[in-house]
Swiss-Prot record:
Phylogenetic classification of the source organism: Bacteria, Bacillati, Actinomycetota, Actinomycetes, Bifidobacteriales
The enzyme's E.C. designation: 5.2.1.8
The protein's name in its UniProt record: Trigger factor
Signal peptide: none
Biological source species: Bifidobacterium adolescentis (strain ATCC 15703 / DSM 20083 / NCTC 11814 / E194a)
One family name in Pfam for this protein: Trigger_N
Function comment: Involved in protein export. Acts as a chaperone by maintaining the newly synthesized protein in an open conformation. Functions as a peptidyl-prolyl cis-trans isomerase.
Protein localization: Cytoplasm
Protein family per UniProt: Belongs to the FKBP-type PPIase family. Tig subfamily.
Length: 456
């Protein structure tokens, strides 16, 4: 098999693959066997029709077509592996030359254009030191947690005064465009200052008492008229303020397992310290990835980026074409960072020679299923049927590569070496652990079995 590679862009290549007859012939033979299972030829048992008879009765063109459909994907994968190209998307394949008869010496030739991972050279991890902010717990942290707990036990009481920030107003809303009502809601409970509904609503409500009305111009954020300007009329039905319990021993015994307020505060301090250490570990992770990418120019595949940006916009607006410039810019920035991080972590996993077992992949998928309240077995089978096991293998590989890489460097805070072993764990030496390639191969078999089952 002859493979020529032409770099169209830093993240896009064109492969021209020419396959010798002796390498393509096994695919032709396999195609004849498959066709023989499906046709009835007088004088022969089904599935036992000689290849030459298949060529004569069915036609060599049909045989070659079947062989191309089955062979080109495999040959394409071999070409990628040979040239060490890591695809980021599905290829565009153009089959240019196919033999027209069993005696035709024409070589199979196809061209594959695909977006690829760019070449990335990571810095050496040996001797790398990364500074991370100290994990601190302040009195403010403890007081904030205490206040949050206090608010959980608060009650709403009606007040006879104008609404202020932090109050809860029961309101009726009516949106008009050109004098016509396009949306309305009644009896909505809204916390002033939360900014969780229409822009301008907080300002309009502040200072209004129960029974009073006002109007303002705002932009509708959902529905058929999303993004359009409308006259928003709002009526205040009632105003309630939050009444919080006193911070004393009685509150501590009611809100927790502790008898005194001092005991409760001490426990909150411990929880705050644990959270601070967790945030520090997250900061260490982010700083490590940033260190790997520092000084590197990492181009992202344009097509992959465009698809991910569109998907990102679908999460914030029903119609991506109506997204604002700010939304588009934010989506592009988010996607570019996500892609760069993914590519760097893939290279890191390869550099650290990460091993991924099938058990780890299935545990990873089971944890996702649990998060969404789904049956793990059903979720895993759906992933297999959709051919997405490869992506799961990749995600597990990235996570393990990240942990392995972080264990190889030194993290410091104010000159002192940090011990992040509680978050990074210990490097496992599992001789039975399978490689990423082996897990991927097993996944391919699972996908094939699922496809065969569906075909039945």
């Amino acid at each position: 098999m002859k493979i020529s590679v032409r770099n169209l862009e830093p993240t896009k290549v064109k492969l021209t693959v020419t396959v010798d007859p002796e390498e393509f012939n096994p695919y032709l033979d396999e195609a004849r066997k498959e066709i023989a299972k499906q046709v009835n030829v007088p004088g022969f048992r089904k599935g036992h029709v000689p290849g030459k008879i298949i060529d004569q009765r069915i036609g060599f063109g049909a045989v070659a077509g079947e062989a191309v459909n089955n062979g080109v994907p495999e040959l394409y994968s071999k070409a990628l592996e040979t040239k060490k190209i890591h695809p980021m998307a599905q290829p565009e394949i153009d089959v240019q030359d196919v033999p027209e008869s069993a005696k035709d010496e024409t070589k199979l030739k196809f061209v594959a254009t695909v977006e690829r991972r760019p070449d990335i050279e990571l810095p050496a991890l040996d001797g790398m030191e990364i500074e991370v902010a100290k994990a601190e717990v302040t009195d403010e942290d403890i007081n904030n947690r205490l206040e949050a707990l206090r608010q959980r036990f608060g009650t709403l009481v009606s007040v006879d005064r104008p609404a202020a920030k932090g109050d809860y107003a029961n309101i009726d809303l009516n949106a008009e465009i050109n004098g016509e009502t396009v949306d309305s809601q009644e009896g909505v409970s809204y916390e002033l200052g939360s900014a969780t509904m229409l822009d301008g609503l907080d300002e309009a409500l502040e200072g209004l008492s129960a029974g009073e009305e006002t109007s303002f111009e705002g932009t509708l954020e959902a529905g058929k008229h999303e993004g359009e300007k409308a006259l928003i009329k709002v009526k205040v039905n009632s105003v309630k303020a939050e009444e919080l319990p006193e911070l004393d021993d009685d509150f501590a015994s009611e809100a927790s397992e502790f008898d005194t307020l001092d005991e409760l505060k001490e426990d909150l301090k411990k929880v705050a310290a644990q959270d601070a250490e967790s945030r520090q570990a997250t900061a260490a992770r982010d700083a490590f990835i940033a260190k790997l990418e520092d000084g590197l120019e990492i181009p992202v595949p344009k097509g992959v980026k465009a698809e991910m940006v569109e998907q990102q916009l679908k999460n914030v607006t029903a119609d991506p074409s109506k997204a604002t410039k700010e939304q588009k810019a934010e989506a592009e920035e988010t996607v570019e960072k996500e892609l760069r991080d993914q590519m760097v972590l893939d290279v890191l996993a390869e550099t650290m020679d990460v091993k991924v077992s099938q058990g780890e992949v299935f545990n990873f998928l089971a944890s996702i299923a649990q998060q969404y309240g789904m049956d793990p077995n059903a979720f895993i089978q759906a992933i297999i049927r959709n051919g997405q096991i490869g992506s799961a293998v990749q995600e597990v590989g990235r996570s393990k590569g990240l942990l392995s890489g972080m264990r190889a460097v030194t993290f410091k805070s104010e000159g002192e070496t940090l011990d992040l072993s509680a978050f990074l764990g210990e490097a496992a030496e599992d001789e039975e652990s399978e490689s990423v390639e082996a897990a991927s191969a097993a996944a391919a078999v699972a996908d094939s079995l699922a496809a065969d089952k569906d075909a039945e």
